[in-house]
Structure formats: structure tokens, C-alpha cells
């Protein structure tokens, strides 16, 4: 299933990942590159799909879109993909590439997630500061220096363009964190925040 932002599997729990990488083509490396791409395809299997992404700006630009998985399963898949990408020298994680994490969240959970990220623990080093304005705390802070409320952030995000904010609270129950580093610790940081938001909502509901 997709929503209007073309994000698949948004109705499933867990964390979904989109991993972008570039391929530097050399005629003499054609078989080598083809082998690497086949290894990736076989490893991902039915757990995700491959698409092209022209914004990466290489001869061949690839985006792996993984279904949402629980943390332990996702770690195994992520690590395997990184192993293959790291082995083949023609596969590059350039300044135009990034890892995007997606979570399903209803309105209350989105708000709790936003409040947890803006309570002082946010770490901008977890983002790749490329052509996208990925520094979430800058977009969460008004020109006066005051932190925007969740409702104000949503209005601002829609005004400037959701694609270019580091953390996007999209329609159809979706939260997207864009342009992360190719590092499991960074994915875990946001997984922790998401699960803390879930626990907060559960505690409020139980009262």
C-alpha cells in the first residue's frame, strides 16, 4: 500500500528504511558491478524493493526500500546491506545519498515523538547535511529563538516543503526521518525515541 507521498508499507508497524547509493560505472568493471547488484537483490529478496532516484546524480542511482521490521530483524538486514555496499568499490554513499527511516504513527504518537526529539536530546550530527535542510532543530525553532510547538511545526513544514525538513510528519499516519548517515547507531537513536513515544502514549491511555 502507498500513500500520496509514495511511501510503501506505511500501515505496518516497526521501522522501514530507504537506503540510497550511487554506482560509478566503468566498462571494465561491468561484471563486477553486476555481481554486486545481484548480491544485493538476492540478499534483500522479498523484504524490500529497488527503485531509481535521479536526485543522487550518478550514472546509476539506486534506492533500496525496505518494509518495516522490528529492531533486531532490521539490524540484520541493514548490516548485510552495508557489508555488500562496503565491499564493492564502485558502490558509493555520496553527499547526495542518505538513509531515510519511516514509522507509522497516529496524531498523538507524532506529537509525543516531536516533543521527545525537541527536549534537548536531538543530535544534528546524525544527519548528512547535504542539499536538503536536514537540521531538525533549526526547522523546529522560530526566528525569535522560541521552540515551535508541534502544531506550529506542522504548519511550518507544510509551508516550506516537507521533503526538505529533517523530520517530516506526513499525512496518512507516517513519520519520516531523512538523510541519516549509513550508521546503525543513528537508526537506533530514532528507534529509541519512537518507542519512548509509544510508551508515553500507552501510559497516558492507561491513566
Language-model segments: which ranges?
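C-terminal accessory/tail domains of diverse enzymes
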Residues: 1-94, 106-207
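Short, conserved phosphate-binding/catalytic loop or strand-edge motifs used
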Residues: 97-99
Amino acid at each position: 500500500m502507498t500513500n500520496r507521498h509514495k511511501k510503501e508499507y506505511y500501515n505496518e508497524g516497526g521501522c522501514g528504511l530507504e537506503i540510497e547509493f550511487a554506482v560509478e560505472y566503468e566498462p571494465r568493471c561491468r561484471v563486477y558491478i553486476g555481481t554486486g547488484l545481484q548480491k544485493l537483490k538476492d540478499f534483500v529478496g522479498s523484504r524490500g524493493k529497488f527503485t531509481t532516484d535521479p536526485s543522487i546524480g550518478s550514472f546509476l542511482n539506486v534506492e533500496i526500500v525496505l518494509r518495516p521490521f522490528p529492531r533486531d530483524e532490521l539490524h540484520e538486514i541493514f548490516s548485510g546491506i552495508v557489508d555488500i555496499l562496503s565491499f564493492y568499490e564502485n558502490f558509493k554513499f555520496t553527499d547526495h545519498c542518505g538513509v531515510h527511516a519511516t514509522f507509522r504513527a497516529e496524531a498523538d504518537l507524532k506529537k509525543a515523538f516531536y516533543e521527545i526529539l525537541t527536549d534537548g536530546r536531538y543530535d544534528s550530527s546524525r544527519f548528512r547535511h547535504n542539499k536538503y535542510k536536514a537540521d531538525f532543530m533549526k526547522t523546529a525553532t522560530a526566528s525569535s529563538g522560541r521552540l515551535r510547538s508541534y502544531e506550529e511545526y506542522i504548519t511550518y513544514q507544510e509551508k516550506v516543503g516537507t521533503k526538505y525538513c529533517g523530520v517530516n510528519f506526513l499525512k496518512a499516519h507516517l513519520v519520516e526521518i531523512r538523510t541519516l548517515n549509513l550508521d546503525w547507531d543513528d537508526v537506533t537513536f530514532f528507534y529509541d525515541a519512537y518507542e519512548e513515544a509509544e510508551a508515553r502514549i500507552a501510559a497516558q491511555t492507561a491513566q
